[in-house]
Amino acid sequence: MQYLSVAEVAKKWNVSERSVRNYCAQGRVPEAFLKGKIWYIPENAEKPERSNKKEQPVTLLDVLQDEKANRYAGGIYHKTQIELTYNSNHMEGSRLTHDQTRYIFETNTIGIEKEVLNVDDVIETANHFRCIDSIIDCAKTTLTEKFIKELHLILKNGTSDSRKEWFAVGNYKKLPNEVGGMETALPEEVAGEMKKLLAAYNSKEEKSLEDILDFHVKFERIHPFQDGNGRVGRLILFKECLKYHIVPFIIEDDLKLFYYRGLKEWNNEKGYLTDTCLTAQDRYCLLYTSPSPRDGATS
């Protein structure tokens, strides 16, 4: 049998000499052997096929995790942080503008001279960024009471609420509350209701958009925390959509009233909330998925 050198094979295969050595060292060239520091390669050896480590399609979650890890500016992760934080906080009364929210995310500073800002708005904005990081990191994990409480703890940490004796940061409410004029679960009922809700939800191996929305409606009706339920609920929505390869969405200001109507009318007409969220999904696809620097990403 005739043998060729690494240089000869590299020229024949149109690859670098380093690639040829790697193929040989990995055992991918039959009957090639090393003598001293020299590889002897059969003259009839064929070039190994390139292995493709990323056979699975790149998902939105992959992109978010990659851009988060690499602190990529201007991509899907960057825009999701700003849009989800601004809109979700704005729904709950935050007076920070979109530009102020963006400035805090991008610079971790506040560039305001004459305007008076609510300190809690600033703290909760910074905390919400961390919440989004958490749902991206933990997107594939099973939804649990512990994780939900951790989201609330992150969101409310360092706020004026956290200094109130009756306000349980990272734990279920101590006092009765309401949402939209509707009664919610009493404090003594919350733990049991949350366990039942999660058990029923997690009993299904795969979740549809309707399953995730149904959980969201029931979560908001329990209203387990003293405050912050809407934001925690919408963070859970986003996480679960990522987990089950459903396009996530952000409820913007012009969809807010339709969203609230959908929550209220869910038992009678699921279409109100579903259609609102489908509209929000279309916007997310249009604004984020298409312009992403990572072509080929799927939900």
Specify the residue positions occupied by each region the protein language model found:
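Single conserved hydrophobic/aromatic residue that forms the stacking wall/gate
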Residues: 288-299
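FIC/Doc superfamily catalytic core
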Residues: 2-13, 17-22, 26-29, 34-290
